[in-house]
Amino acid sequence: MTLPAILLLSGIILLGAYLLYGKYVFEKFNINDKNQTPSHQYKDGVDYVPSKPIVVLGHHFASIAGAGPIVGPIIAVTFGWIPAIIWILVGGIFFGAVHDLGSMIASMRNQGKSIGTIIKNNIGYKGKQLFMIFSFSTLILVIAVFADIIAKTFINNPGVASASILFIGLAVVFGTVNKFVADKKSLFIIISIIGVALMYYFVYLGMQIPFALNYELWLYILLAYAFIASVTPVSLLLQPRDYLNSFLLYGLIIFATIGIFYANPEIKMDTQVNITSENLGYLFPVLFVTIACGAISGFHSLVASGTTSKQIDKEGDAKVVGFGGMLIESFLAIISVAAVIILSREEYASSLSLKGPVTMFSDGLGSMMATLGIPEQMAVSFVALTVSAFALTTLDTCTRLARFTLQEYFEGAENPVGKQLSGNRYLSTGIVVVLSILLIRSGGFTTLWPIFGSANQLLAALALLAIAVWLININVNATFVLIPMFFMFTVTLTSLGIFAWKNFQEEAYVLSIIAAILFVLSIILIILAKKSLEQKPPIPEIGNSFK
């Protein structure tokens, strides 16, 4: 089979899944545009802002994509490109899309609150607090890691820093203008065209005016930006930046697809499936932890139930944003695999070691896009900058999500400190930023990062658990959620067990203990869920539910 044929077949499967399986899932969730969404019910102009579906899709897609659907699939090709593609397609359709849409709809039916609140309403208060501590800790780790990565990227590529600053300025202008023309479709289209054109121009301009600072300055500038992005109205900075940035990814997907079809490169990598890898371990469970974004990722549930659910205008918009957004990401993951299987297995192994996944992705697509008449170096730079731009999107979205998590954790607190943390977005964001700085300064994030893959997939399993219990409690057949849930618990518990034992043997006791704690956490939440179903408690009348 040729590379264009693989891409075409994958695209047809994903589109067919949206039209066929998607229809089944939409009916199971009883999506109804007559239901009032939280963005209208709790509209505050800061977090709850009803927005156009294309704008919300841009925010959601930009937030969930990042480097995940590029790095994970390319590393997982170590086991063979056929199992990687199969997991992306099966996982994206039956696991990830259900997980993302379910998180979004469950949140919308519960005041636009997070998965933690879904757990509280359906499993219990203890379950909520445990989940919130886990998700908050994970978000702080992600903020620290990405702040470090972006600061180093800006040092090595000052042009990327310049382009990123220009993007932020453009986003603020776009968000401000959009407030006055949002209700006028023709004007919105015009400012979108102008905004996207300027954004692509800023890609070029940024490379011409590199902006160089040292690591310390970039680190504090980035975290100051993250603070501002977390507390300002979502429609002023976060949403327009993500919306405009999403067109970089759309452009990347379009140019890459055309380039693959036009170049029609030979697939040099063999079809061998490796059950084990010297560096990674066994195909099960490692493949299913390594390919998260593109198949199923717990981080998506935090975005879907955190920022996105508060911006959905009508419930029907969640179909394309939640379910469709995941399938678009799956297609991007397929492109990532395509970018490296034009290498032989020996060339792949050497490049992975020397260059890393992002450079391999940039070089692979750059060479194919060059056949369209685009200078190869320009194409490679465009791909690399696109990936870097979405790292910044992950940083600002995670900061806002961590703020939401902290506020929800202390929601209903009677002590003065808890009340302040719950009600004051400036104080809660300040704590998020300070904790991130402390983690960076300590260097602890480099120690903790190896466990993120397993922790992220545990988030997915727990989100599916919350969705399943919620559906069962309102008398909906949850089999379509329970099957991926059981599989993901099997994957994550196996992965955590292996990880804990391996690190114990290597005397990396901190990682071993954390893995053991996460293992126990998941067991506790499963037991709490089982008890709640046996007791069948009444579900509080919060938000809109099924008719």
At which residue positions do the language-model features occur?
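Transmembrane helix-loop junctions in multi-pass membrane proteins
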Residues: 2, 68-70, 82, 141-158, ...
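Extracellular loop-to-transmembrane helix junctions
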Residues: 2-19, 76-107, 116, 161-171, ...
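Membrane-interface "cap" regions at the ends of multi-pass membrane proteins
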Residues: 13-70, 282, 286
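Membrane-helix boundary/coupling elements in multi-pass transport proteins
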Residues: 67-74, 91-93, 99, 103, ...
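Extracellular/periplasmic helix-exit of transmembrane alpha-helices
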Residues: 260-274, 327-363
